[in-house]
Amino acid sequence: SAGAGSQVAPLGGVIDSIAVTVGTVVAVGDLLAVIEAMKMKTEILARVSGTVAAIPVQVGQAVDAGAVLVEIA
């Protein structure tokens, strides 16, 4: 389930890139990942500041809208 620090996919697509690793300290607005859907790339930016605690997806993985991409603690 998505918690306060969960960054979720705003749309379905494929993970194009992941810009952070577990332990990365991020600020609001930092790039976390990029999702590609129908040849359009969508940047996923941090909504909260903190430390990346988990990344339950990997590059090339198909995700649905609402899927947790990055957990920030």
Language model features with spans:
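Structured functional modules or segments
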Residues: 1-73
